[in-house]
């Protein structure tokens, strides 16, 4: 560790490194455990948007095949027909929730589930878990989530020991932009998809909101999300302090108002108590006079 780095950074780095090893071991346990405790159900996507997409693909298939029948020979037509039919078959399987490659991605699916449970970045499909799997997931989260928050906390201390204020804002924005570029490349984004969708997707991951259709491919996206969470957490803490300082005068006025209301209510309560006490004393005097 360089001598020019702040001691706070060096101490946080050593703690972060240790807890990262522990977290990786915990995620590895989940990667092995969850595939055995999950039974993905085949679900039919019966919404109108899914049906509309299937109809559009079928119409496109028929139109292209009809046009190519007139202009191309038999060999070219067969090759094109195979390509179009393969695309339509994939869309049809996806519509009915059938994933032919699911068995090959069992460990990747287990890693994604363990990462989502530990980082609180969802969503997860509860139907994918067996009854025992749901119980194990609860116990797994009780250990994994605090462990992950510890890693994020140490990363946040490293970040704030180097960058603060405007510099932290600039670093976070630049990192989100670079992460969106990497995400777009890894996910194979097309030119027809606006780049703002990649930025929005990255922002959802960094703020632990997540998105329904997100699936990480490889280890790189996980590393990007962890560092992004640390940056966003440090930024949120700084914004929290700024907001508290900004609204402190209003909070002080509100506390004074509450104090005045409490004193007023206390005085009313004391008045009622004194009235009740005086009435009781008068009744006691009347009873004593009756006996005399």
Curated annotation (Swiss-Prot):
<dbReference type="GO" id="GO:0015271">
    <property type="term" value="F:outward rectifier potassium channel activity"/>
</dbReference>
<keyword id="KW-0812">Transmembrane</keyword>
<feature type="transmembrane region" description="Helical">
    <location>
        <begin position="17"/>
        <end position="37"/>
    </location>
</feature>
<keyword id="KW-1133">Transmembrane helix</keyword>
<dbReference type="GO" id="GO:0071805">
    <property type="term" value="P:potassium ion transmembrane transport"/>
</dbReference>
<feature type="compositionally biased region" description="Acidic residues">
    <location>
        <begin position="282"/>
        <end position="292"/>
    </location>
</feature>
<feature type="region of interest" description="Disordered">
    <location>
        <begin position="267"/>
        <end position="292"/>
    </location>
</feature>
<dbReference type="InterPro" id="IPR003280">
    <property type="entry name" value="2pore_dom_K_chnl"/>
</dbReference>
<protein>
    <recommendedName>
        <fullName>Uncharacterized protein B0310.1</fullName>
    </recommendedName>
</protein>
<feature type="transmembrane region" description="Helical">
    <location>
        <begin position="166"/>
        <end position="186"/>
    </location>
</feature>
<feature type="transmembrane region" description="Helical">
    <location>
        <begin position="216"/>
        <end position="236"/>
    </location>
</feature>
<dbReference type="GO" id="GO:0022841">
    <property type="term" value="F:potassium ion leak channel activity"/>
</dbReference>
<feature type="transmembrane region" description="Helical">
    <location>
        <begin position="135"/>
        <end position="155"/>
    </location>
</feature>
<dbReference type="GO" id="GO:0005886">
    <property type="term" value="C:plasma membrane"/>
</dbReference>
<keyword id="KW-0472">Membrane</keyword>
